[in-house]
């Protein structure tokens, strides 16, 4: 989730603030998550049209580690920039997840957050409105976009093991090969957002405070 702002220089900024908590959260990991999201989502340098004006889309991501955050603070949040993610070594289903398409909360499994994993950038995409693509066989179509999930069929160089046949163990997309493409920015449909005084909101409040999984 984030706050969208258009400035006088024809730049559209999406501001999001990542707040982490949980037994596996650390200041260093929090900054790594922030950097991954900001770096990857700014890579396309995408130009889009808003009200017949070409604007460049930029993401400004800040982050904060709040070890002792309370459930009340999360539940009562009314700042559209704030996104809350619990980080733990154990997660039910063995996956990281967010609380729906268009949301501002979720649960990250520590193992999924290694440097270059693209997990944080992928889950952030869900918070601002993007779902997994329907066609999960993109062989012959090049680099997978950021919203493709694990299990997607891709060209060999994007697999866990390029020597494996597609669809077998090792023969599916390695998440580290995902990239944020211009198409991902276009899919945000920013031109349909209603602005007021050059500001708008992308995503929705879910404000879920997650407990550790047992």
Where are these regions (language model features)?
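Metalloprotease/metallohydrolase-associated module, dominated by Zn2+-dependent proteases
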Residues: 99-115, 134-214
């Amino acid at each position: 989730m984030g706050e969208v702002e258009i400035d006088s220089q024809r730049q559209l900024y999406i501001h999001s603030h990542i707040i982490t908590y949980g037994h596996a959260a650390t200041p260093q990991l929090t900054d790594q998550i922030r950097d991954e999201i900001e770096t990857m989502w700014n890579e396309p340098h995408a130009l889009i049209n808003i009200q017949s004006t070409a604007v460049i889309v930029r993401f400004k991501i800040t982050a904060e580690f709040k070890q002792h955050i309370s459930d009340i603070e999360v539940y009562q949040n009314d700042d559209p920039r704030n996104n809350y993610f619990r980080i733990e070594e154990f997660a039910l289903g063995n996956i990281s997840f967010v609380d729906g398409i268009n949301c501002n909360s979720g649960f990250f499994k520590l193992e999924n957050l290694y440097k270059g994993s693209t997990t944080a950038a992928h889950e952030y995409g869900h918070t601002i409105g993007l779902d997994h693509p329907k066609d999960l066989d993109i062989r012959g179509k090049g680099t997978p976009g950021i919203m493709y999930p694990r299990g997607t069929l891709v060209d060999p160089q994007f697999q866990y093991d390029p020597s494996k046949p597609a669809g077998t163990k090792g023969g599916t997309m390695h998440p580290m090969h995902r990239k944020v493409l211009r198409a991902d920015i276009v899919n945000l449909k920013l031109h349909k957002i209603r602005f007021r005084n050059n500001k708008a909101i992308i995503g929705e409040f879910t404000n879920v405070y997650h407990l550790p999984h047992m």
